[in-house]
């Protein structure tokens, strides 16, 4: 059974970029985390690592670096996914204050092989490959290789301090960068028009309803025009991403 030698890594959850994902996202992301915390305390486990998300961290003005030292509240973030992760993160830190040896990691946009659940970036690449992505959004995000996230989680399990959080980031890539890398890596000829963020925000609700009915991935709400600059800690050092390699690995599943 579980004891002081046991390390629990809580990475289960629902990721959704939908504007209205429903109550299930709270039942799983918040309720599930609460259950894990209760069982960890009951069984006296030695270590808990909770896999949160950078979406749980409140945004700062453009050009300002975000850090793990933040107040986690659903009132300070946008979208149900971010709110659910912020609530769950606050629960974990509260448990750490009560004596649980718990640390939190905050991955940025995870990309790489083995995405059986087909996350947003994988869906975008698959849609692009099949010719179902006529338009995309200007802007981009900070992406991190899933294998580097796994290494970061392991490092946190071994060296993470109780009540501390660690951002697991890679580097910024624009949507254009990703699609151009896909074209070059996979020898594709695809034409894509790039919409300004301001226009994308206007048409996103309509596109989301249309994509749901036509089974085309809803992508607009995932992207932000602000660069996510993450502060890295010495305890969890991650290597740089080679974008073309990750694109290739995303297909070679």
Task: Outline where the language-model segments fall.
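Substrate-positioning beta->alpha
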Residues: 35, 87, 120, 137-157, ...
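A conserved pocket-lining segment of Rossmann-fold NAD(P)-dependent short-chain dehydrogenase/reductase
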Residues: 73-76, 124-144, 148
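Conserved Rossmann-fold NAD(P)-dependent oxidoreductase catalytic core, especially the SDR/UDP-sugar
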Residues: 22-23, 31-81
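NAD(P)H-binding glycine-rich loop region in Rossmannoid oxidoreductase-like domains
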Residues: 1-31, 39
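Conserved beta-loop-beta element that borders a ligand/cofactor-binding pocket
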Residues: 52, 90-113
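A hydrophobic C-terminal alpha-helical subdomain
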Residues: 136-138, 146, 197-235, 246
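Mid/C-terminal beta-alpha module of Rossmann-like enzyme folds, strongest
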Residues: 152-215, 244-253
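Conserved catalytic-site region of short-chain dehydrogenase/reductase
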Residues: 17, 54-64, 110-119
């Amino acid at each position: 059974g579980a004891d002081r030698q046991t390390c629990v890594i809580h990475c289960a959850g629902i990721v959704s970029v939908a504007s209205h994902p429903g109550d299930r996202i709270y039942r799983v992301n918040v309720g599930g985390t609460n259950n894990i915390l209760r069982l960890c305390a009951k069984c006296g486990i030695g270590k808990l690592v909770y896999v949160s998300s950078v979406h749980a961290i409140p945004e700062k003005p453009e050009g300002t670096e975000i850090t793990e030292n933040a107040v986690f509240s659903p009132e300070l973030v946008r979208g149900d996914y971010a709110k659910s992760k912020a609530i769950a993160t606050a629960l974990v830190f509260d448990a750490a204050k009560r004596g649980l040896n718990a640390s939190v990691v905050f991955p940025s946009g995870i990309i790489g092989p083995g995405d059986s659940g087909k996350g947003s970036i994988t869906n975008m690449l698959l849609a692009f490959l099949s010719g179902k992505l006529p338009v995309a959004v200007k802007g981009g995000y900070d992406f991190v290789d899933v294998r580097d996230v796994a290494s970061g989680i392991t490092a946190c399990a071994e060296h993470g301090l109780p009540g501390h959080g660690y951002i697991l980031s890679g580097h910024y890539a624009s949507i254009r960068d990703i699609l151009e890398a896909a074209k070059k890596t996979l020898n594709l000829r695809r034409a894509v028009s790039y919409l300004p963020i301001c226009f994308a925000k206007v048409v996103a609700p309509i596109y989301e309803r249309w994509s749901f009915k036509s089974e085309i991935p809803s992508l607009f709400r995932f992207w932000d025009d602000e660069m996510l600059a993450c502060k890295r800690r010495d305890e969890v050092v991650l290597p740089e991403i080679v974008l073309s390699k990750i694109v290739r690995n995303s297909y070679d599943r």
